[in-house]
């Protein structure tokens, strides 16, 4: 069907819409690329992508994620194993018994998931990276961009009250192009006030903050 075939609204809000079933899942099922900036990332959140994408592996869908540098200890340890070549090779693709996480490891091994870390490097930014944008692309090069939600959960039971503003390449081309440019500049580490690193580089160089005491509900 493609993204243009979805009956998209300009805004989705928790009191009026089921944001997961009306927006996220239709877009995920009809895209071949998904770019996303989120405040923080958990292994539970990332593993849901292997389920949320309809035919993720078959369609070779690409996922690029940029997140902040704070993690739970358990999440960071498991993400390191999933993204580290030395771990995945030693376990020969059978690192995790959990089915969802095993699927995640498979698509990471296939090169379908890339993860980068954004860390503020300016006195003007006091805390952490918290930009919230997302971009879907389909096979016809149509694009849907959105802003507003901080979570990447596809459970209707665990979401916050939130709203999502939506822009499409066929109705709001200039704004979509601006969001695409913003993401690409972040991805290429060309954005002022933040430095962006590959996940494994950040982990190996002790740039990530983690603690079992942090409460990061996702």
Where do the protein language model's features map onto the residues?
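PLD/PLD-like phosphodiesterase catalytic module centered on the HKD motif
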Residues: 1-218
């Amino acid at each position: 069907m493609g993204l243009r075939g979805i009956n998209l609204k300009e805004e989705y809000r928790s009191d009026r819409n089921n944001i997961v079933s009306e927006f996220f899942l239709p877009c995920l099922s009809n895209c071949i690329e998904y770019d996303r900036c989120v405040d923080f990332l958990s292994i539970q959140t990332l593993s849901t992508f292997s389920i949320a994408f309809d035919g993720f592996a078959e369609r070779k869908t690409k996922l690029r994620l940029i997140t902040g540098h704070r993690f739970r200890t358990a999440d960071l340890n498991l993400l390191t194993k999933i993204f580290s070549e030395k771990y995945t090779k030693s376990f020969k693709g059978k690192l995790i018994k959990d089915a969802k996480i095993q699927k995640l490891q498979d698509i990471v091994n296939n090169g379908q998931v890339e993860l980068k870390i954004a860390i503020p490097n300016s006195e003007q930014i006091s805390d952490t990276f918290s930009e919230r944008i997302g971009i879907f692309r389909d096979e016809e090069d149509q694009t849907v961009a959105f802003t507003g939600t901080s979570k990447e959960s596809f459970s209707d039971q665990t979401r916050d009250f939130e709203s999502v503003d939506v822009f499409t390449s066929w109705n709001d081309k200039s704004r979509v192009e601006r969001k695409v440019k913003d993401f690409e500049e972040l991805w290429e580490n060309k954005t002022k006030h933040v430095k962006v690193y590959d996940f494994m580089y950040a982990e190996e160089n002790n740039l990530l903050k983690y603690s079992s005491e942090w409460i990061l509900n996702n």
